[in-house]
Amino acid sequence: MAAQRTYLAIDLKSFYASVECVDRHLDPLTTNLVVADASRTEKTICLAVSPSLKAYKIPGRARLFEAVQRVKEVNAQRLQTAIRQKKAVRGEDGQYHFASTSFDANALNADPALGLSYIVAPPRMQRYLDVSTQIYKTYLKYVSPADIYPSSIDEVFIDVTGYLPYYHMSAHELAMTMVREVLYNTGITATAGIGTNLYLAKLAMDIVAKHIPADKDGVRIAELDEQSYRYLLWNHRPLTDFWMTGPGTVKRLEAHGIYTMGDLARFSIHGEDRLYEIFGVDAEILIDHAWGCEPCGMEQIKSYKPSTNSISEGQVLSTPYPYDKAKLIVREMAEILMFRLTEKKLVTESITLEVGYDRENVDKGGYRGLTQTDRYGRTIPKAAHGTVRFDAPTNLGSTIINESAKLFERITDPALTVRRITLNANKVTPDEGIYQVDFFTDTKKLEKEKKLQQAMLGIKNKYGKNAVLKASSYEEGATMRQRNAQIGGHSAGGSDGKLQK
């Protein structure tokens, strides 16, 4: 029987918000701050919300307008307190106002008559990547790269099994040592979970740690094994709190009277076949997780490769775009996709395009076509969807850009405004440099185009993505120049990632 292993899961607390607070010499745990690009619209997503602001029931991925509305609600209550305490001031408009406001939680707790304020920090993705790299190097002082898996910019899994006897530490002591050094070096607090498998480490961090008191630095560390998991979490709700259990899965489970992991475990004893009928091969994962089991270890997750490979580009437009401007965006996205394929030395067999229409098409009246409901429950025209397959795998811009534009023309209703566009390169494979040719194929022209793409890519990599652009990228409504200055669809914060004043 294999020896029991010990895993850590470490999550940096409200990472983007914490970086912004530290760079402003503010306490990440007591400063009210959201990371959001307010220059877009108030519908923009908050990439992070500081812990003290979350305490007012503002979720971590709220829309900015939702945060604004919630703060207004809180301040309406606080203003009544200020009036009762005769600390409010009456303005020239005859209305009462706060005498003062604060974005510091300690000050707000000490004086209920203060108005709640907060900082809106524009995202600086390059800065976050730099800090994440610094923190990763801290982990590497204690463990080998082979035993650590970064699952995201702010979360890692570590197999510490072999390090506990080496350092003469318990898992809790080693986790605390690493988390403390991260805090000392960066000012950023972390939460850690310890488990006998990766799944339990993740749940210890995500669920159990949230319900235990933090230490003076805001650090929480929780532990789970198979037995304590069943004791602590078999009755936990909602099921969506559990790793890899999304709303769709939960809905199907609840249809069969399964509301907790304990319910699922008990159901699996006699109803395993039924679970496989409902979920197919995914039933195995659900059953394992219900019992607190996870067979995959560090080696397996590091070596995992998806069965199908694709590369995608997607964006939500800042305003509703008419047909012609949306077509320009599709051509720009296809060009970006082409350069990504060229850089990775990949080719694609086909392109899939999805065009999402704006709600204004329904709100204005007159639309009588098919509809769907968006994530906010609003009625919008049904998205357009289509695929074009190439005669042979390719990464040539002349093919990808032109065929993407033709596909847009074929599937998109020119009378509707567009809000979302997603372009996928499907079944990407290594570029073997082989062309499917016939008597009419100009192979010299193909080679010339490929060399030109590689030359342009070299210039972009050396001097920046905006060093070489088509004239169309300077047209009104074009987004390539702006997107080239972003990381993951958000502002990099300038070439040096510096704090904006």
Labelled PLM ranges:
Residues 27-30, 34-38, 324-326, 393, ...:
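Compositionally biased, low-hydrophobicity segments enriched in charged and small polar residues
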